[in-house]
């Protein structure tokens, strides 16, 4: 898991779409074993090949890397062939025996010797998805021998997440690394990869210097099993058979963190201050947690905690500690002294900033004296002429050339009655005339539909159903009808009708009118384009042709009541036999109390 020499913005290349994360980690793990390290071009060619392989039928789960290698074209660019060959070489066959489960060892028996590792034990097997989720760290059972397992990407990410909130060399940092070393039994190569993944290049260089110093001292002092003729300690620690030397190298690698030179800048825990209203015990608890995570291992914490508990406290707690003489007392005395302290209620004071006097210089916008330019009502002048029309009086955003041209509405014909009395202008309720055209625009008159007592508002229209030739007919304009009604004679051939319930003046009916869900075109005399309806009512008795609100709302019209020149006539009112309310239920028999009880008083 060494560094990748390239220009990739992230240390982990992104997986191609459609490929599982654990499969992509297997390919990355094999690519990182190449010498020299893979480049960005190699990862780009690997992603391109995997995108093509995902579309083939041999892409199964688990992946057969032998079949996958047969798909690589001859002379394919990059190092894809080497990466696939590493996976083919280390692929676990389905018939391989399962790993033996370590049995618990009794105190009276001696532990069995560990099986001899294979010569290629440093090569990790392909990643297998675990059946149950496990959390880092995982400790081995007591007495069970630890088996070497190289790092996987998810292991390195888990370790880095654990130490991300701890300072370098702190107890939490060192405890996490000890658990990782105890669990994975890493070699010298694995420890170097872990160091490069967790720390910066400067820390890696300093750790390398301290580790070389400790190794030289250990080789001079002598170690059990160390043979100077077999090579340096780092090389002998990579041998899986040398368990003792590997343990010694791991301890030296951990000890190199405690001997790193301290940081020159102030640590983060030195900047922790007590708030104005923060309790003293909460402030000391924050200091204690920060020192546990930030102090190097072996550094005494108690004197630093006592010093910061006084120097970083607020002024009121410092005055209390000074008055009691506990500026450098044990921490328990300081906590008991300040435990009864509570922040005083601060008197709220309204701070009003006085307004600056107006300037004596003239405003650069309007040239007047007595106000600031930000308060000037004059708009900001443009810096120069408009680049579109060369007019210096407006900005480019206000240029009239940028405004879209106004679309002219469709001219409507005028359908006025022939009587001369209807052409007189009428004054509206709040002033103005009936028609007030703009002087700069053409007059566009909406259709006027008269309503007279002598005759019904009937228009001559043409109706086309299902793309047939429009047929002329007389239609009644009814603003109280929700849907348009046409007779069945206008519909050519048999069509599919739907039952519907109609509520009219004479009650409910579900036999005379049917619902026709067929496109309908209505040609009105005052409109050039036809009115298109998706459905309408069909009169099976062929009595009614009604233009309802669904058609009238598409053509903006105006209903008016013309003046009747004849004198008014008083006619007797005859109550009809059926008024259309017979279908409603009878009203409830409930006594009605007077709304105003005070009105019934004498």
UniProtKB/Swiss-Prot annotation:
It comes from Human T-cell leukemia virus 2. The gene is gag-pro. Its EC number is 3.4.23.-. HTLV-1 lineages are divided in four clades, A (Cosmopolitan), B (Central African group), C (Melanesian group) and D (New Central African group). A motif (PPXY motif) lies at residues 124-127. A motif (PTAP/PSAP motif) lies at residues 94-97. SUPFAM superfamilies: Acid proteases, Retroviral matrix proteins, Retrovirus capsid dimerization domain-like, Retrovirus capsid protein, N-terminal core domain, Retrovirus zinc finger-like domains. GO terms for biological process: proteolysis; symbiont-mediated suppression of host gene expression; viral translational frameshifting. Gene3D superfamilies: 1.10.1200.30, Acid Proteases (2.40.70.10), Delta-retroviral matrix (1.10.185.10), Human Immunodeficiency Virus Type 1 Capsid Protein (1.10.375.10), Zinc finger, CCHC-type (4.10.60.10). A lipid is attached at residue 2 (N-myristoyl glycine). One of its GO terms (cellular component) is viral nucleocapsid. Residues 473-551 form the Peptidase A2 domain. Residues 94-121, 399-425, 582-602 are annotated as: Disordered. A zinc finger (CCHC-type) spans 361-378, 384-401. Keywords: Aspartyl protease, Capsid protein, Eukaryotic host gene expression shutoff by virus, Eukaryotic host translation shutoff by virus, Host gene expression shutoff by virus, Host-virus interaction, Hydrolase, Lipoprotein, Metal-binding, Myristate, Protease, Repeat, Viral nucleoprotein, Virion, Zinc, Zinc-finger. The record marks 136-137, 350-351, 446-447, 571-572, 579-580 as: Cleavage. One of its GO terms (molecular function) is nucleic acid binding. Residues 97-121 have a biased composition (Pro residues). SMART domains: ZnF_C2HC (SM00343). This is Gag-Pro polyprotein. The active site is at residue 478.
């Amino acid at each position: 898991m060494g560094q990748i020499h390239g220009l990739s913005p992230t240390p982990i290349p992104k997986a191609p779409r459609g490929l599982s994360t654990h499969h992509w980690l297997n390919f990355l793990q094999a690519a990182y074993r190449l010498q020299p390290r893979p480049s960005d071009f190699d990862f780009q060619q690997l992603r391109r090949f995997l995108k093509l392989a995902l579309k083939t039928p041999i892409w199964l789960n688990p992946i057969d890397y032998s079949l996958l290698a047969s798909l690589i074209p001859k002379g394919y660019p990059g190092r894809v062939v080497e990466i696939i060959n590493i996976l083919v070489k280390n692929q676990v066959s389905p018939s391989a025996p399962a790993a033996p489960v370590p049995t618990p060892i009794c105190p009276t028996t001696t532990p069995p010797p560990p099986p001899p590792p294979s010569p290629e034990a440093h090569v990790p097997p392909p990643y297998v998805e675990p059946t149950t989720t496990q959390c880092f760290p995982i400790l081995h059972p007591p007495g069970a021998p630890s088996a070497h397992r190289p790092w996987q990407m998810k292991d390195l990410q888990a370790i880095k997440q654990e130490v991300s909130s701890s300072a370098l060399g702190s107890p939490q940092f060192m405890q996490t690394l000890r658990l990782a070393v105890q669990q994975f039994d890493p070699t010298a190569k694995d420890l170097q990869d872990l160091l490069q993944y967790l720390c910066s290049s400067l820390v890696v260089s300093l750790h390398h210097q301290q580790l070389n110093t400790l190794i030289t001292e250990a080789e001079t002092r002598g170690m059990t099993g160390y043979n100077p003729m077999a090579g340096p300690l780092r090389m002998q620690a990579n041998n899986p058979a040398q368990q003792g030397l590997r343990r010694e190298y791991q301890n030296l690698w951990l000890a190199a963190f405690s001997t790193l030179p301290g940081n020159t800048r102030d640590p983060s825990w030195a900047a922790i201050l007590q708030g104005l209203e923060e309790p003293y015990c909460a402030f000391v608890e924050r200091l204690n947690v920060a020192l546990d995570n930030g102090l190097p291992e072996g550094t005494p914490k108690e004197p630093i905690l006592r010093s910061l508990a006084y120097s970083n406290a607020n002024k009121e707690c410092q005055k209390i500690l000074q008055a009691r003489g506990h500026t450098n007392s044990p921490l328990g005395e300081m906590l008991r002294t300040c435990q009864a302290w509570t922040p005083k209620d601060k008197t709220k004071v309204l701070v009003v900033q006085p307004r600056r006097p107006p300037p004596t210089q003239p405003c650069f916008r309007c040239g007047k004296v007595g106000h600031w330019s930000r308060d000037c009502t004059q708009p900001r002048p443009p810096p120069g002429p408009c680049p579109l029309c060369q007019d210096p009086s407006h900005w480019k955003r206000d240029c009239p050339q940028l405004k879209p041209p106004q679309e002219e509405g469709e001219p409507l014909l005028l359908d006025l009655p022939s009587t001369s009395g209807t052409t007189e202008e009428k004054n509206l309720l709040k002033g103005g005339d009936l028609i007030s055209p703009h002087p700069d625009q053409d007059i566009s008159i909406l259709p006027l539909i008269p309503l007279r007592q002598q005759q019904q508002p009937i228009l001559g229209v043409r109706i086309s159903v299902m793309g047939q030739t429009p047929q002329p007919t007389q239609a009644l304009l009814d603003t109280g009808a929700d849907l348009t009604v046409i007779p069945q004679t206008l519909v050519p051939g048999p069509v599919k009708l739907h039952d519907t319930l109609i509520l009219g003046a004479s009650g409910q009916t579900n036999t005379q009118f049917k619902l026709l869900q067929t496109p309908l075109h209505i040609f009105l005399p005052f409109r050039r384009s036809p009115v298109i309806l998706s459905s309408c009512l069909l009169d099976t008795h062929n009595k009614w042709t009604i233009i309802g609100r669904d058609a009238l709302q598409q053509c903006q019209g105006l209903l008016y009541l013309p003046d009747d020149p004849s004198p008014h006539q008083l006619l007797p009112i005859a109550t009809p036999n059926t008024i259309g309310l017979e279908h409603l239920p009878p009203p409830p028999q409930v006594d009605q109390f007077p709304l105003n009880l005070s009105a019934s008083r004498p």
